[in-house]
A protein has these predicted regions:
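Oxyanion-binding/catalytic loops of NTP- or PPi-dependent enzymes
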Residues: 1-98, 104-109, 114, 118-119, ...
Length: 281
């Protein structure tokens, strides 16, 4: 297995290659994953059950924090990444996040969520996702995994980036580099190796829309500018569809309707129309 070393520009070359594994982590709004480089290709490490993606969902089941599992209860936390560096006021006043208002522990200097009697901070919730990724990687690789490169939204400010670093640290990771998600996508496809010019690369995820303007010359990738919106992504498209289907059918907004709306969206990816409660969509 190839170990990729990432160093700062201008740093002296290391004569000896480290035998320590460095993993890449995509901490996503909807799903997260972890990978290693194997023969110059990214190899995604599968979670228990054989799935590559870990839903970024926090739940409390029988008094224990769980990740990626849901049940019929509404008391689960989705899209953890959207909450990072947000104040209680930010969460209450944001229409997308305000559904969590009843779970907020008010009076705290930093926001905490009370989930089935357990209070947990926002970085601690993110750390639970990192812990599951780490344990699965160590099980698959048969080795301790400490170092990681983590992708973050291009628009993340220092506070949000700091909370990602803190969450990873709580999980036992040493983050050697944060990389903007569109930039990571460009590297993943090796664009800098066979492409020259200035390009706009976008990443439309579950909860964020990011863009980076990249200049690629002679195998070197330079980030010219970045931007994005952390309230524009697949989750928001889902909710717009939920509201539309609710108005069309008279059904109340519920977890069941959200699941059905996602099914409609996915079907429309390969069909021109879908029947929903007798209506053509």
């Amino acid at each position: 297995m190839q170990i990729i070393e990432i160093s700062e520009p201008g740093a002296s070359d290391q004569s000896e290659q480290s035998d320590e594994i460095v993993v890449g982590i995509d901490f996503g709004t909807t799903n997260s994953l972890i990978a290693v480089s194997n023969n110059h290709k990214a190899e995604i490490i599968k979670m228990s059950g054989g799935l590559e993606l870990l839903p970024s969902i926090i739940n409390i089941i029988d008094g224990k924090v769980t990740v990626g599992k849901t049940d019929a209860s509404k008391n689960i936390i989705r899209s953890v990444k959207r909450l990072l560096a947000k104040s209680s006021e930010d969460i209450i006043n944001n229409t997308t996040l305000s559904s969590l208002s009843d779970m907020l522990v008010l009076g705290e200097s930093t926001p905490k969520i009370s989930l089935r009697g357990t209070e947990i901070s926002l970085p601690e919730m993110a750390a639970e996702v990192f812990k599951v990724l780490k344990s699965n990687a160590e099980l698959a690789l048969g080795s301790s995994v400490q170092k990681a490169v983590v992708s973050v939204p291009a628009y993340f400010d220092d506070s949000a980036r700091g909370q990602v670093l803190f969450a990873a640290k709580l999980a036992g990771f040493e983050v050697i580099r944060l990389i903007a998600e569109p930039t990571a996508a460009a590297y993943a496809y090796g664009l800098q190796n066979n492409t020259e010019g200035t390009y706009l690369v976008y990443d439309l995820g579950g909860g964020t829309f990011d863009v980076s303007i990249l200049n690629m010359q002679l195998g070197v990738l330079q980030v010219v500018a970045t931007g994005g919106d952390n309230m524009l992504g697949g989750d928001d498209i889902d909710m717009l569809l939920v509201e539309y289907l609710s108005a069309l059918s008279g059904l109340k907004v519920s977890t069941d309707l959200i699941a059905r709306a996602k099914g409609v969206k996915e079907e429309l990816s390969f069909k021109s129309e879908v029947i929903f409660d007798g209506n053509i969509i």
